[in-house]
Amino acid sequence: MGAIVLVALMALVASSSAFSDIEHNIMKLEGENIISSSSTPNDDQSSFSDGTSDMVESLFLNSGNRNLVLMMLSGRPQPNGRCIGDAQPCGFLVSDKGCCDPNYCSEYSKGKCICVPKGQPCGLLHFCCLDLTCDGYFNGTCK
């Protein structure tokens, strides 16, 4: 059953027009955990000088309970203003660009680039706004 879920998920990602040029890397880890990551290089270069890509899409599946545990779309600062700014539409149905740091996309497929303000919950996928830090890795507060 786990193999069927993985095949269906990979077919969905591979058939998406936004991901047609994406390189897929699949790694088998300890036990039944599978990590799949994809990246799309810039139009004019394959990656930035620091090796980061224009867009990163990560999936983490645990076939023990067959739940999608983590689905993340994140962006990095990009040269020439090629990232998506504050409160602008984002997600794989909207653009192949990621949000400018420290913003993240509020929804995987169609959201807005936002950051977590002071005093609000933050963590691994919910980044604090500039000049703020999260006091916990998974469950923290922006200070």
From Swiss-Prot:
Expressed in trichomes, that are stiff epidermal hairs located on the surface of petioles and leaves. Plant defense neurotoxin that causes pain and systemic symptoms in mammals via modulation of voltage-gated sodium channels (Nav). Potent modulator of human Nav1.5/SCN5A (EC(50)=55 nM), Nav1.6/SCN8A (EC(50)=0.86 nM), and Nav1.7/SCN9A (EC(50)=208 nM), where it shifts the activation threshold to more negative potentials and delays fast inactivation. Also shifts the voltage-dependence of steady-state fast inactivation of Nav1.6/SCN8A, but not that of Nav1.5/SCN5A or Nav1.7/SCN9A. On Nav1.7/SCN9A, principally acts by binding to extracellular loops of domain IV (Nav site 3). This is Beta/delta-urticatoxin-Uf2a. GO terms for molecular function: sodium channel regulator activity; toxin activity. It comes from Urtica ferox. Belongs to the urticatoxin-2 family. The keyword Secreted applies. One of its GO terms (biological process) is defense response. It comes from the Eukaryota. One of its GO terms (cellular component) is extracellular region. Residues 1-18 form the signal peptide. Residues 19-80 form a propeptide. It is found in: Secreted.
